[in-house]
């Protein structure tokens, strides 16, 4: 157990990374705190861990997320301070969008800067995360009234590197509707590294025209799609089976307390909805798979959906993602307002159920005001969803320009077109790359990072 992993906020992508490293690297011991009350974890977890983690001569590397105040832990536990200390940034607090700037907010970003000074290696999950942190330090430190420290960026930058968040993409072939099989073939290899292997290049069919061109010209092309009736019928039949399987799986899971909330998340019977759909056109299925918190800007998302309804456009929506202590009021209001448009509502603890919903969806939306990577968006794209993301934050680093929007009005316009012609995006093949973000591509970097030779003074 030479690798000591500490996670002060064991939930979401933080949990996903810890679990992956523990399973794949083996020689690890893990200490965590539940993903509750983030601000209190950032303030107090170092003292808790200093009293909880036993002294061991076997530790060589300490890996922690930036929620932990590494400076406090190293001071409280000099034996841990001597280890090779790796600090991983899922997000940074220097540009966090707060509703109201309060003096206490300064401490969270300040603690992250101090932790970087103590760490031996500082790793970020994206270039955007790293650069936004390093280039914001000067402005951030000007909040100090006087006697400000200097040259922090030049001290910290040499320690920094980017290793993208590693996603272990599962085999979802059993969940894929027929119209996504071409997408699946482009994405998947057969095996390797305990999971699906992705082709390092994701080509699309030469005859596949840009979806924007199709949208501009769809009225003149209607005649060219008259031969799709049989394919659509096959797709609808397959989709009905997939929805039915999910319903049965959820019903079975209700016998377990772990999955006890799943039943309420199936707001309506999917088979009842799909059974009445004209075989010529299944309604567009929009998915929003993010944390139910204000920094993901659910208000903007639901405002766009309500505008679609006001225009008389029909669609289905699945609102997934984890909830924490405080859930914004907009969620209960939106659920009532969206009514029969809702297909799934709430967190799905079962990964199979989660990926099955993604495979059945057509479009995945982000309206985030705070995003440094976006695991859920990439998982949805892997499952064949067409992504629509803000032209901001980390998204231009990950997604081609076609999938970015600049304003809520642009997002609404794109969705209006998709609601009218969902078949256009169902035959679209993603033009970006998924492979660089897979565990298959990144495991070597993490192994090298975490299993390097111990320091000479240990």
UniProtKB/Swiss-Prot annotation:
Its EC number is 2.4.1.110. Residues 242-262 have a biased composition (Basic and acidic residues). It comes from the Eukaryota. One of its GO terms (cellular component) is cytoplasm. It is found in: Cytoplasm; Nucleus. Disulfide bonds: none annotated. One of its GO terms (molecular function) is tRNA-queuosine(34) beta-mannosyltransferase activity. GO terms for biological process: regulation of translation; tRNA modification. The keyword Glycosyltransferase applies. Residues 242-267 are annotated as: Disordered. Its main location: cytoplasm. Keywords: Cytoplasm, Glycosyltransferase, Nucleus, Transferase. It catalyses: queuosine(34) in tRNA(Asp) + GDP-alpha-D-mannose = O-4''-alpha-D-mannosylqueuosine(34) in tRNA(Asp) + GDP + H(+). Ubiquitous. Expressed at high levels in the lung, brain, spleen, testis, placenta. ovary, pancreas, spleen and peripheral blood leukocytes. Expressed at low level in the colon, small intestine, kidney, skeletal muscle and thymus. Expressed at high level in colon adenocarcinoma. InterPro entries: Glyco_trans_1, GT-like_domain_containing_1, QTMAN_N. Glycosyltransferase that specifically catalyzes mannosylation of cytoplasmic tRNA(Asp) modified with queuosine at position 34 (queuosine(34)). Mannosylates the cyclopentene moiety of queuosine(34) in tRNA(Asp) to form mannosyl-queuosine(34). Mannosylation of queuosine(34) in tRNA(Asp) is required to slow-down elongation at cognate codons, GAC and GAU, thereby regulating protein translation. Belongs to the glycosyltransferase group 1 family. Glycosyltransferase 4 subfamily. This is tRNA-queuosine alpha-mannosyltransferase. It comes from Homo sapiens (Human).
